[in-house]
Regions:
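Serine-esterase "nucleophile elbow" of acetyl-processing enzymes
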Residues: 5-66, 73, 251
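Alpha-helical cap/lid subdomain in secreted, periplasmic
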Residues: 4-5, 68-268
Length: 268
């Protein structure tokens, strides 16, 4: 048990729809998703109290910013047992709207799937910066931390974007695929070089799967389980929805717990 006297330490986690406690599915609006998600399950294994600020559809600016805000909010940093960043896709653009007194929003953050400014190499560079910012922040306060790329960072955009579940729900052809707008070979080479250069700046012993690209010999967390690849996996919501179900979140929790021990983030 990770405790301060009689108090449990905090496990702080941020990510996207594969991590949020408030997941729902447009493909299955009547399905019950009230089961425990992996951050809560992991906190129970580690004897910690979870703070899960993940939200569906969000990108890496959101993930970094919400983790930073939770960390600085806690005055006694010794109360923080572990912080986990489960990174999302680089092209996503996050933005925050100030609360309007005449219209109370339940959540100030929103996002768009593809940023309308910049290009793929820039978006990846921006995400690499968030990796580094997160590391520097945790080192500044001497907080135990780990990070990993939960889903693909950029490859999906390079290969051509498929419609998201919302588009498919409203009639888009699920097999239609957009064409990459840039020079695919040149941009991929630039991105891979950029990622390798960041290896000199990051503490990769605390970045599980580094480098987060299969072509460079690393992995994304989605490569570790069949949830995202096998349409008939018993651990995903359905063939239509590749998100983890209750069994999937248990599998994610168990795998992360094993990796935390392998990377010596926590003791066995």
């Amino acid at each position: 048990m990770k405790k301060i006297g009689h108090l449990m330490k905090y496990l702080i986690v941020s990510g996207d729809s594969n991590t949020t406690a408030d997941f729902d599915s447009i493909s299955h609006p009547d399905m019950d998703f009230s089961y425990k998600k992996w951050p809560e399950l992991l906190a129970e294994k580690l004897g910690m109290k979870v703070i899960n600020v993940a939200r569906s559809g969000q990108g890496n600016e959101f993930i970094y910013t919400t983790l930073r805000d939770e960390i600085v909010k806690i005055e006694d940093k010794s109360q923080i047992g572990l912080v986990i960043a489960a990174w999302s896709q680089a092209p996503r653009k996050d933005y925050k709207q100030e609360e309007n007194p005449s219209f109370r929003q339940p959540w100030p953050w929103s996002s768009i799937r593809i940023d309308t400014h910049g290009n793929l190499p820039y978006w990846v560079q921006r995400s690499l910066g968030y990796y580094l910012n997160f590391q520097i922040l945790c080192e500044r306060y001497n907080i135990p931390y780990v990070q990993f790329q939960m889903i693909e960072l950029f490859e999906h955009y390079l290969q051509g974007i498929l419609p998201d579940p919302i588009d498919v729900h409203f009639g888009a052809d699920p097999n239609s695929q957009s064409k990459y707008p840039g020079n695919k070979k040149k941009d991929e080479g630039s991105i891979l070089k950029m990622i390798l250069e960041y290896e000199k700046k990051l503490d990769t012993s605390k970045f599980m799967g580094w480098p987060p690209v299969k072509k460079l010999g690393g992995w994304r967390f989605r490569d570790q389980l069949d949830i995202w690849y096998d349409n008939n996996s018993p651990r995903r919501v359905s063939p239509l929805d590749c998100h983890p179900n209750g069994l999937g979140h248990i599998a994610i929790c168990d795998k992360i717990n094993i990796l935390l021990q392998e990377y010596k983030i926590i003791k066995e």
